[in-house]
């Protein structure tokens, strides 16, 4: 009986520690919130008069870098259409660009993800953008970049950030 009680207390402590590690990002100058799944994520740029969009890193910029942009689009534009437009007009000009696949994505806001690879300073980088539809004229683009191997390892964390992204 004593072992069961000790095991239960240890299990409860571990579950509480896991929940406590997750924080919610919110700022008065942005219209959204999302969960930050690990303390390794930190804001390097907060919104102010000069910068409208926050930026985050996972330890180091090469390990994981996140920018969030609000895209105002024509009525009826889908996240998939915006993803293809970004690829055609912006991403394909990156050095060593290799397009990835587009996948549907469900969270508090639904949309699509687009993955791609490119080269920066001789290193293979991975980009993964979540296009999340807020309404028929607003799509939020959560752009993650980092070294291919390192960003791939934290895919579950990028998914958590995108899944918990919601409007205030």
PLM feature spans:
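Positively charged n-region of N-terminal signal peptides that target proteins for export
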Residues: 1-4
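Sec/Tat signal peptide C-region and signal peptidase I cleavage site
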Residues: 17-21
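Solvent-exposed coil/turn segments that connect beta secondary-structure elements
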Residues: 30, 39, 71-73, 119, ...
């Amino acid at each position: 009986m004593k072992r069961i009680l000790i095991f239960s207390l240890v299990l409860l402590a571990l579950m509480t520690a896991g929940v406590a590690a997750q924080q919610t990002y919110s700022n008065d100058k942005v219209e959204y919130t999302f969960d930050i799944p690990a303390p390794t994520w930190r804001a390097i740029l907060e919104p102010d008069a000069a910068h409208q969009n926050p930026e985050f890193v996972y330890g180091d910029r090469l390990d994981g870098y996140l920018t969030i942009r609000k895209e105002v689009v024509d009525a009826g534009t889908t996240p998939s259409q915006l993803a293809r437009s970004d690829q055609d007009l912006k991403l394909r000009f990156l050095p060593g660009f290799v397009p990835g696949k587009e996948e549907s994505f469900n969270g508090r806001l639904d949309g699509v993800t687009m993955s791609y690879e490119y080269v920066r300073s001789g290193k293979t980088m991975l980009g993964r953008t979540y296009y999340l539809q807020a309404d028929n004229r607003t799509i939020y683009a959560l752009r993650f970049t980092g070294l291919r191997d390192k960003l791939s390892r934290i895919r579950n964390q990028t998914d958590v950030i995108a899944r918990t992204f919601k409007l205030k």
